[in-house]
Amino acid sequence: MAEARRFSPVHELDVGQILSEARHRWLRPPEICEILQNYQRFQISTEPPTTPSSGSVFMFDRKVLRYFRKDGHNWRKKKDGKTVKEAHERLKAGSVDVLHCYYAHGQDNENFQRRSYWLLQEELSHIVFVHYLEVKGSRVSTSFNRMQRTEDAARSPQETGDALTSEHDGYASCSFNQNDHSNHSQTTDSASVNGFHSPELEDAESAYNQHGSSTAYSHQELQQPATGGNLTGFDPYYQISLTPRDSYQKELRTIPVTDSSIMVDKSKTINSPGVTNGLKNRKSIDSQTWEEILGNCGSGVEALPLQPNSEHEVLDQILESSFTMQDFASLQESMVKSQNQELNSGLTSDRTVWFQGQDMELNAISNLASNEKAPYLSTMKQHLLHGALGEEGLKKMDSFNRWMSKELGDVGVIADANESFTQSSSRTYWEEVESEDGSNGHNSRRDMDGYVMSPSLSKEQLFSINDFSPSWAYVGCEVVVFVTGKFLKTREETEIGEWSCMFGQTEVPADVISNGILQCVAPMHEAGRVPFYVTCSNRLACSEVREFEYKVAESQVFDREADDESTIDILEARFVKLLCSKSENTSPVSGNDSDLSQLSEKISLLLFENDDQLDQMLMNEISQENMKNNLLQEFLKESLHSWLLQKIAEGGKGPSVLDEGGQGVLHFAASLGYNWALEPTIIAGVSVDFRDVNGWTALHWAAFFGRERIIGSLIALGAAPGTLTDPNPDFPSGSTPSDLAYANGHKGIAGYLSEYALRAHVSLLSLNDKNAETVEMAPSPSSSSLTDSLTAVRNATQAAARIHQVFRAQSFQKKQLKEFGDKKLGMSEERALSMLAPKTHKSGRAHSDDSVQAAAIRIQNKFRGYKGRKDYLITRQRIIKIQAHVRGYQFRKNYRKIIWSVGVLEKVILRWRRKGAGLRGFKSEALVEKMQDGTEKEEDDDFFKQGRKQTEDRLQKALARVKSMVQYPEARDQYRRLLNVVNDIQESKVEKALENSEATCFDDDDDLIDIEALLEDDDTLMLPMSSSLWTS
């Protein structure tokens, strides 16, 4: 049934057809959305219109034209008499809010209205669609006018015949499909589009075609059957027949038939069998007079198989004729039978049946007109008023119409009907909200599939939300939300009640800061949209359900796009200024000092390794920006070479100096990405971990700016990855290079530095046991990024576990030393650390030991859970306080006895017996010294405990960053690139070492060859001498 109540979706809307229909009716939300989303196809007005007429539509840009409402018309004002009184409503397409709508009523002409629409979507919210239209009154007043015309028509048969002719002309051009009626007959008539009442023309249009509209129903409407209802013998859908059709038939004739979804396709209708004869008969009937029609009338109405359109026609003719109760009963029975037959058969009858039933319809009209008994006409009027426009009929009018009638003082009979038949507007509105949830159950579940549970509604609505700000918040942040609306209860009940707001499944208290304004704090939540509504601190929605969005915020120290460029430019300028600075006492490097000359040669060799780089730049075509960068680096190389030689010759600190801002050459090179400046500066005597004025090393600067190549070079040169900067407000205990990289979004660099710091910390531990497991080093370069990151997680986890194991062993050793009070009884450091290595087990007990160890780890993890640990600490603290109170009481109680006994002994023995001074001259300096020694030891222990706690926190943070690196593909790729950089640097070092060794080998081979040549020369010289001697 829920699927049957849903309207068919909007297919393709013809914007031209929509604009042509806008001259005579209000547009629906899907149509307005189509226009606003295609605003590029229309001309946007740059000036406000001057007294636009009814049916005018305009489009404005709110950012360009702010005062587009100044149109020259006199609109209804608020109580102050200055501000235009506009009502606001959010319109829906389906079940989603899509539009803002503002209504204004004319002061002089109350039927003249202005409606302004714009989308809720932020990208298109600046485009405004304004529609001016003069409505023709309300349903109730229209029905009374119809009654008056019916009485006049009963007295004037000629006018009735003319009206009948116009009726037939209207149906010839404005007939609706049978398939459309099959959907509408199962729903109730609703002229509201998301909470605003439409005039008569909109009622007619929405009754025939309700594609894409979002309609709210009450519980009575959902439970009402398709046939029958409160109007005995009539389908509730045909309450629209009470509106005068002669007013809008003329307007509908101007609309093209082929493009309208409510029109009959004339080409298909004419080609249908039996339709041609029907049209010919209709033309002949139109040309006849009323007397000829009455003369050609046939038998009665009892056997008339009425179709929906003929039923609509006959209902109007009933009002224009007199009839008997028997005829009315038979007509009622035939209508019910015809509707049941249509519903059971699926309404598959052809349009031909409609035309074939026209002759029978005319016969029924003539039969009713021949029985002129007018006394029953007033009875029919009362039946229609109390049935079609009674309590059930008025309940179908939406809440916004009643609110408009009450607040704006709408004129006409509709206001009186609302006041007489509606006891509580909020109660009826809430029933409609509940019925909307019930009728669109599948749709609502589909729209709210992101929520854990759909909001629960209370019995009545107590608060109406107009707007709330802000409508979103960042994840992990709490913001103050202001909700503006209207209390639907009295002031006393509002002040007594406890209000709250629901954000998803979290309820937070709300404060009433003014009449209709609530204030609450949005709780922290995951990213996404959650339902937002007001409750009475019972988790039940007592207001409309809106959406609140949580967005993800990128955590960065500053804006990378704007501030990085300016910071880099400033650092470059400071670097050039430092290199260009010359000291007063400049002495060149003397050639006598061999060490300085060798150092100068090494620096020159490293800086000018590629002398042909300028020639390559001239030969190859490169961009102008790259040319400038290369020329700047060549200039900086020359300046750095002369500056390093100058500082080496001066002696003292040498190159380990800082500029006016507190940074040195190594820091500038690391931050700017000048890899060629690192090794010469370090060879010149600057430490790799040389700190600036804030305690930052070169590795800190490289990690801060994300210099992957620089980080690999510094790690290869021996930089310490775990050094801490000076404390600052952002990092009270100092920050590591990993902290700076993570704060700037370089998660891959942070993961690599964290892993490297853990492995470096393990390598510092003096584990002398040969059976100790070794932590795996960096993975092979042929593996994938995911494999490398998983290997890093495994290495970091193993390193952190072993470090914690060492800490526990050391703390256990100190406890033993304190317990026995003798250092000889305690274990040595080497023995304590060697006990950490896993012992060799027998093959038979290995499996059982592993299972026992795994069980112990599970128990420890469960005990170390956050909540359990917190509860344990709270309970322990309470127990310690109780114990302290008890011990203090006991100590004071015993202390009094001791003081009394000591006082007696001191007076009796020391003073009276020995005639001495007693304890009055007693000095406790030795005791004080012992106590001071104990406090110093305790302070040292506290210091070590605090330091170890901070180290453990850093280890946990480093391990968490390595694990989080696996979740982000970009971080894994960055980690992979950094591994490749380190591997390339190591390979280049190995190749250089091999080249140097081969060069030395070649030199040794040359020396051997020379010795052999000398030996050969000696042999050639000795041979003639020996021969001469032999001959002699």
UniProtKB/Swiss-Prot annotation:
Tissue/organ expression: Expressed in roots, stems, leaves, carpels, and siliques, but not in stigmas or other parts of the flower.
Compositional bias (Polar residues): 174-195
GO terms for cellular component: nucleus
Phenotype caused by lack of the gene: No visible phenotype under normal growth conditions, but the double mutants camta1 and camta3 are impaired in freezing tolerance. No visible phenotype under normal growth conditions, but the double mutants camt1 and camt3 exhibit semi-dwarf phenotypes. No visible phenotype under normal growth conditions, but the double mutants camt2 and camt3 exhibit dwarf phenotypes. Reduced growth, chlorosis, spontaneous lesions and constitutive expression of defense-related genes when grown under 22 degrees Celsius. Enhanced sensitivity to insect herbivores.
SMART domains: CG-1, IQ
Name of this protein: Calmodulin-binding transcription activator 3
Organism lineage string: Eukaryota, Viridiplantae, Streptophyta, Embryophyta, Tracheophyta
Subcellular location: Nucleus
Native organism: Arabidopsis thaliana (Mouse-ear cress)
Family label: Belongs to the CAMTA family.
Modified residues (Phosphoserine): S272, S964
Location of the region described as Disordered in the Swiss-Prot/TrEMBL record: 146-197
